[in-house]
Swiss-Prot record:
Compartment(s): Membrane
Name of the protein in its database record: RING finger protein 148
First and last residues of each zinc finger (RING-type): 256-297
Major place of residence: membrane
InterPro entries (UniProt xref): PA_dom_sf, PA_domain, RING_finger_E3_ligase, Znf_RING, Znf_RING/FYVE/PHD
Native species: Bos taurus (Bovine)
Signal peptide: 1-34
All copies of domain PA, residue ranges: 65-167
PROSITE patterns assigned: ZF_RING_2
Keywords: Glycoprotein, Membrane, Metal-binding, Signal, Transmembrane, Transmembrane helix, Zinc, Zinc-finger
Length: 303
């Protein structure tokens, strides 16, 4: 019974831990509304001398609040020494009043929303923001609430500085921004969490199935084997038939501590390994139930 209780308790504890793990993993998963990241393909065209150069690359990412649309235009810089376009009075050097244009703006100095609004108010078709110096070509999806009507993408600092230098040299640069691929960075976390939970579930079910049918049978077999070992040990214990003159029959000797009767001639007694004696009819059932001497607790299976 003790083994069964332990096994049942172990299963209950494991089940409880597995349930708590599942809840933790589910709560740790990202919100189903988590945004995907959309890359931006930039088709860059400019002329150097008589050569027309065209570059196509997955150079940027769309902002979180940007429409996912194709947009094109000549690339224009903010006027003045500061390229962050944080001042609402910032103007842009447009080549022609009717040509569509894209603002190339440096990150920093104010929020993305403010930069984008400044360019949008001046008539930009879209906004390209390049990252801080020292960040290489690292990009991330910008947050710019309130500017959902204009395309906004981020490109790396290296690519941004390359475009900046071309335009500052008077090179006419045109860019077509197209929607690239969708990435879901939270998906790997979701898959890993799901895999961990499923692995734990399968492991628990395997152990549960392995132990559940085995537990009761194992306990029963163990008890049967123990009884058989006790019977075998009892059978090896010495027997005597008391005769007149034996010291056990003397008045000052102890009685049988199991039945409390005095010993009489012709009584059959069992002598344990600890040398204590008892009526055979009394001690054999006792040993089957307890397997120890009633007086000194000596275990007959350990001697």
């Amino acid at each position: 019974m003790s083994l069964l209780r332990i096994t049942s308790s172990a299963h209950s504890s494991a089940s409880s831990r597995l349930w708590r793990l599942g809840i933790f993993l589910l709560l740790s998963l990202p919100d189903s509304k988590g945004k995907a990241i959309w890359t931006a393909h930039l088709n860059i065209t400019f002329q150097v001398g008589s050569r027309l150069i065209s570059e196509l690359g997955e150079s940027g990412v769309f902002g979180n609040h940007s429409p996912l649309e194709r947009v094109s235009g000549v690339v224009v810089l903010p006027e003045g020494w500061n390229q962050n376009a944080c001042n609402p009075m910032t103007n842009f050097s447009r080549p022609g009043q009717t040509d569509p244009w894209l603002a190339l703006i440096e990150r920093g100095g104010c929020t993305f929303t403010r930069k984008i609004n400044v360019a949008a108010e001046k008539g930009a078709n879209g906004v390209i923001i390049y990252n801080y110096p020292g960040t290489g070509n690292k990009v991330f999806p910008m947050s710019h609430q309130g500017t959902e009507n204009i395309v906004a993408v981020m490109i790396g600092n290296l690519k941004g500085m390359e475009l900046l230098h071309l335009i500052q040299k008077g090179v006419y640069v045109k860019i077509i921004i197209e929607v690239g691929r969708m990435h879901m960075p939270w998906l790997s976390h979701y898959i890993m969490s799901l895999f961990t939970f499923l692995t734990a579930t399968v492991a628990y079910l395997f152990l549960y199935c392995a132990w559940r049918p085995r537990g009761p049978n194992f306990s029963t077999r163990r008890q049967r084997q123990l009884k058989a070992d006790v019977r075998k040990a009892i059978g090896k214990l010495q027997l005597r038939v008391l005769q007149e003159g034996d010291k056990e029959l003397e008045p000052d000797e102890d009685n049988c501590v199991v039945c409390f009767d005095i010993y009489k001639p012709q009584d059959v007694v069992r002598i344990l390994t600890c040398k204590h004696i008892f009526h055979k009819a009394c001690i054999d059932p006792w040993l089957l139930a307890h397997r120890t001497c009633p007086m000194c607790k000596c275990d007959i299976l350990q001697t």
